[in-house]
């Protein structure tokens, strides 16, 4: 909306010129350090970014108003494959990427062509993001801005990794790693399309010797080798005959497997054949020494494993189907027994499932595997299947043992026979790199790893979680589990933008690994930029960040004035640790645990963040926002269409923190219209005729808004933005409309000025631009520099609050009844009960509820079970405002009678009759007179 964006632009310029968000050390104030996960500069900010950044900004603004010295900085991630893959895609003319930039983000094609240069791409989007952050009204201290390729930041990260290496948390070893064959470096979740973390498993490989060739079979169940009766391959797929350069063996595997396994083994392809050309060849089962035939099967997927399968029809339904479809007899050799299945589990599964679809059988097969592994044991008869020289080993180590125990012994047997190996597979594949290539597993001989499996380190990180408040609370368990299961992680790349590994400048530290303790760098970023990088050595950072060393000696060594060094150290001591770390919930899988590990490892357990806030996703069109769904919504577009403050509310406050938020045009338009209504309403309200006396209705509105202050204060403290949003932008608006109606269109200007002052300040964290515009109708100061409201600012009268709230409660009861009627009523009859004995009983019931007493306990206390139950029911249904004020006596008849016109207007009826149910002369219509109770009038609608 133009109106909202115009006032936003106006006040942003004022705030910028006044430098209201710059934060420096102030020992007279308690500090709060708020940070968000910084963005990759590979495309414009979208509304998903907006949710996280605005949530943090609302919290930062709230804390400033509470009197804290708040630092909220921002920076830009230039490192990693997200940027490199976009640059490469533009370079090769990727139509999808180019179309997204032109059609979704409205970037000129002449600019897009320059994105093939990663440095230009990053710099362009850095400026775009900076401008968007300003447009969004983020209250950031822009002096502390940096990028991850700034020279000073590079020295900071290099210092961090030298520290980790010295402690022993960095290691170099041979290991399997998810790898992009095109970009030629390891990949993780942030490097893949859809942000999928490649999950690597190892598979056992068994060699089946043929006359001239070895058929390489991959399996997750090597113990079933005793029941292997054939070799299965896909006749329509390509198969490669390859030489293992390590031992000269000639192996058969699918061509797709050869391409993948070439990254794990040294292989040379000799020949390529169709699978059908290999059908009929014979091989030997290395354990039973039986001759097996190579047979065709459509169920064999050449992409999985080696594309060669040992057929075990007793325990694998798909193998049984494959052999059955050949219309020839075949042997079935059971190997595993369990109480859940008979002698031939595969046949039982097929009979139960009543399908031959591999997809439909998957869950049944998974269940069979799981039960046989956890509950099964190897049959004693397997001893009879092996030659004499194996019988002792099989009899003692395998036969009769649980499958869990026997599996390792079978592997040992196969290794002793020289027919066992291992390969690695991405179990959740196919996973694609951002460049479009399918991710494979590569075995590195000299890959650098961060040893997240180190037991001492891991234990300290888990312990540190006790010091951290995590919102939502259920995320702490998830984070604990992820930390507990963490393994060594490769953290370097061979190309791209980023920080060079200090002891191997051929390697670049990846984007998840250079963004771990970078929040410390914010504190000194604005000052160290001016220093020559040569003096930003380990001793500099040891002193500034850790307080190690002597400032006088360091000053002489580095040529930096001692006072400057001590000031830098003092700033770190003042601001750190982070008080609230904000990110999307997706970063629980990687960034958040890495962030904690590195804080504990480098800075110590006492420097972990005090709070971690994880928000849900944004959905567009009912789906999680994703490029693959074509529903990416640029933040700038949303702001242009709906207005800054509308977007701030729509992206943060229409759902609870952990839930996803649906961003839709209808919701955004509705919010924008409500903001305009509020603006116009306040503008008109302060112009209305004032009365001199303070009326009951004036005391009511003042008291009611006073009650809201604590509610909203608590909501903002705990980031319950939805409740605060509803209260500020809808409840208070409706309350003030009722105030005008109850006050016959007149106001008490002193009361209302104070009420509006509070209302505007309650808006300020959420919609700062609208709040600033409205504030200047009352005052010439800046609302962003005002204190958060306190209850003491407004007059408070319990009786006035209770009486009007009782009136509104009665209206709610009647409207609830109206909603269930097929015809609109014209007349309302209300019976009120003024019996003090019954009123006292309901008060007692309210107290019992507050004390969490049970109904049986209350019944014993009262003695009269029926009356106790009624009182308890009424007390439970009362709004909190009435419960909290119930100790005050009120005259229900007088309240309703004196506000009869208001009732008529609000209920839209022609007549209203109010009776005292205890008056003998009162007519009893439809028996409602006798059932009226205090706080629960008898109501008839006709």
UniProtKB/Swiss-Prot annotation:
One GO biological process term: leucyl-tRNA aminoacylation
Gene3D superfamilies documented for this protein: Class I aminoacyl-tRNA synthetases (RS), HUPs, Isoleucyl-tRNA Synthetase, Domain 1, leucyl-tRNA synthetase, Valyl/Leucyl/Isoleucyl-tRNA synthetase, editing domain
InterPro entries to which the protein is assigned, alphabetical: aa-tRNA-synth_Ia, Leu-tRNA-lgase_arc, Leu-tRNA-synth_Ia_arc/euk, M/V/L/I-tRNA-synth_anticd-bd, Rossmann-like_a/b/a_fold, tRNAsynth_Ia_anticodon-bd, Val/Leu/Ile-tRNA-synth_edit
Localization, UniProt: Cytoplasm
Keywords from the UniProt entry: Aminoacyl-tRNA synthetase, ATP-binding, Cytoplasm, Ligase, Nucleotide-binding, Protein biosynthesis
GO cellular component: cytoplasm
E.C. designation(s): 6.1.1.4
Molecular function as annotated in GO: aminoacyl-tRNA deacylase activity; ATP binding; leucine-tRNA ligase activity
Pfam families tied to this protein: Anticodon_1 (PF08264), tRNA-synt_1 (PF00133)
Residue ranges annotated as motif 'KMSKS' region: 624-628
Locus of motif 'HIGH' region: 39-49
Reactions accelerated catalytically: tRNA(Leu) + L-leucine + ATP = L-leucyl-tRNA(Leu) + AMP + diphosphate
Binding positions for ATP per the UniProt entry: 627
Subcellular location, principal: cytoplasm
Family label: Belongs to the class-I aminoacyl-tRNA synthetase family.
Protein name: Leucine--tRNA ligase 1
């Amino acid at each position: 909306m133009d109106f909202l964006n115009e006032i936003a632009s106006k006040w942003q310029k004022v705030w910028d010129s006044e430098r209201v968000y710059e934060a420096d050390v102030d020992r007279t104030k308690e500090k709060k350090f708020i940070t968000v996960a910084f963005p990759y500069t590979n495309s414009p900010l979208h509304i998903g970014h907006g949710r996280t950044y605005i949530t943090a900004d609302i919290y930062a603004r709230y804390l400033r108003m509470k009197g804290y010295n708040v630092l909220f900085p921002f920076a830009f991630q230039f490192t990693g494959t997200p940027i490199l893959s976009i640059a490469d895609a533009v370079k090769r003319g990727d139509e999808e990427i180019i179309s997204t930039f032109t059609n979704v983000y409205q970037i000129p094609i002449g600019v897009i062509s320059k994105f093939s240069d990663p440095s230009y791409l990053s710099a362009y989007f850095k400026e775009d993001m900076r401008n968007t952050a300003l447009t969004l009204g983020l209250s950031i201290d822009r002096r502390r801005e940096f990028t991850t390729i700034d020279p000073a930041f590079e020295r900071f990260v290099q210092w961090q990794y030298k520290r980790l290496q010295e402690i022993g948390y960095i290691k170099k070893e041979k290991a399997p790693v998810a790898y992009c064959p095109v970009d030629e470096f390891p990949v993780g979740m942030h490097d893949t399309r859809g942000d999928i973390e490649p999950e690597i498993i190892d598979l056992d490989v068994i060699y089946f010797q043929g006359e001239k060739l070895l058929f390489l079979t991959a399996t997750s169940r090597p113990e079933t080798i005793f029941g292997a009766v054939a070799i299965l391959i896909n006749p329509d797929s390509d198969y490669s005959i390859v030489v293992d350069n390590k031992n000269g063996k000639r192996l058969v595997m699918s061509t797709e497997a050869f391409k993948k396994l070439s990254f794990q083994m040294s292989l040379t392809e000799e020949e390529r054949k169709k699978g059908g050309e290999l059908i009929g060849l014979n091989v030997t089962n290395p354990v039973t020494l039986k001759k097996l035939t190579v047979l065709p099967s459509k169920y064999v997927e050449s992409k999985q494993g080696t594309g060669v399968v040992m057929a075990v029809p007793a325990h694998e339904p798909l193998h049984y189907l494959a052999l059955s479809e050949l219309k020839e007899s075949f042997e079935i050799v059971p190997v595993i027994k369990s109480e859940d299945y008979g002698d031939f589990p595969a046949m039982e599964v097929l009979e139960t499932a009543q399908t031959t679809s591999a997809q439909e059988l998957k869950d049944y097969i998974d269940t069979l595997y799981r039960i046989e592994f956890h509950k099964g044991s190897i049959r004693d008869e397997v001893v009879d299947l092996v030659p004499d020289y194996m019988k002792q080993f099989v009899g003692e180590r395998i036969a009769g043992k649980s499958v869990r125990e026997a599996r390792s012994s079978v592997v040992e047997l196969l290794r002793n026979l020289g027919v066992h190996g291992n390969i690695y597979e991405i179990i959740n594949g196919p996973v694609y790199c951002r460049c479009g290539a399918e991710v494979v597993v590569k075995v590195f001989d000299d890959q650098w790893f961060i040893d997240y499996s180190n037991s001492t380190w891991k234990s300290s990180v888990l312990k540190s979680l006790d010091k951290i408040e995590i919102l939502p609370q259920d995320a702490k368990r998830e984070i604990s589990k992820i930390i507990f299961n963490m393994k060594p992680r490769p953290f370097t790349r061979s190309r791209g933008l980023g920080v060079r590994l200090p002891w191997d400048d051929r390697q670049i530290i990846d984007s998840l690994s250079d963004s771990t303790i970078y929040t410390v760098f914010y504190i000194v970023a604005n000052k160290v930029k001016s220093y020559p990088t040569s003096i930003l050595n380990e001793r500099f950072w040891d002193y500034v960040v850790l307080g190690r060393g002597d400032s006088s000696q360091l000053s002489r060594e580095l040529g930096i004035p001692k006072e400057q060094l001590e000031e830098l150290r003092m700033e770190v001591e003042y601001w750190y640790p982070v008080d609230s770390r904000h990110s999307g919930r997706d970063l629980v899988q990687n960034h958040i645990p890495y962030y904690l590990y590195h804080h504990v490892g480098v800075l110590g357990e006492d420097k972990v963040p005090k709070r971690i806030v994880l928000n849900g996703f944004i959905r567009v069109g009912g789906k999680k926002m994703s490029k693959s769904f074509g529903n990416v919504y640029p933040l700038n577009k949303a702001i242009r269409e709906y207005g800054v403050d509308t977007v701030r509310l729509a992206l943060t406050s229409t759902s609870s923190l952990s839930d996803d938020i649906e961003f839709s045009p209808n919701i955004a338009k509705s919010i924008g219209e409500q903001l305009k209504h509020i603006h116009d309403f306040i503008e008109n309200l302060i112009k209305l005729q004032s009365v001199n006396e303070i009326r009951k209705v004036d005391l009511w509105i003042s008291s009611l808004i006073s009650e809201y202050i604590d509610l909203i204060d608590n909501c903002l403290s705990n980031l319950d933005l939805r409740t605060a949003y509803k209260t500020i932008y809808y409840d208070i608006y409706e309350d003030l409309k009722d105030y005008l109606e109850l006050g016959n269109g007149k106001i008490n200007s002193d009361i209302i000025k104070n009420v509006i002052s509070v209302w505007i300040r309650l808006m300020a964290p959420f919609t700062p631009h609208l709040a600033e515009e409205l504030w200047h109708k009352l005052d010439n100061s800046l609302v962003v520099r005002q204190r958060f409201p306190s209850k003491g600012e407004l007059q408070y009268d319990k009786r006035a609050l209770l009486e009007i709230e009782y009136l509104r409660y009665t209206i709610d009861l009647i409207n609830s009844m109206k909603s269930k009627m097929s015809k609109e009523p014209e007349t309302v009859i209300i019976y009120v009960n003024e019996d003090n004995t019954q009123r006292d009983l309901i008060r007692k019931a309210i107290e019992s509820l507050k004390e969490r007493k049970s109904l049986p306990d209350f019944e014993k206390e009262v003695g009269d079970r029926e009356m106790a139950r009624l009182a308890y029911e009424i007390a439970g249904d009362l709004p909190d405002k009435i419960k909290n004020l119930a100790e005050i006596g009120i005259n229900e008849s007088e309240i309703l009678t004196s506000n009869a016109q208001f009732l008529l207007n609000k209920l839209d009826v022609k007549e209203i009759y109010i009776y005292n149910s205890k008056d003998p002369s009162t007519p009893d219509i439809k028996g409602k007179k006798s059932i009226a109770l205090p706080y629960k009038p008898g109501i008839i609608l006709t």
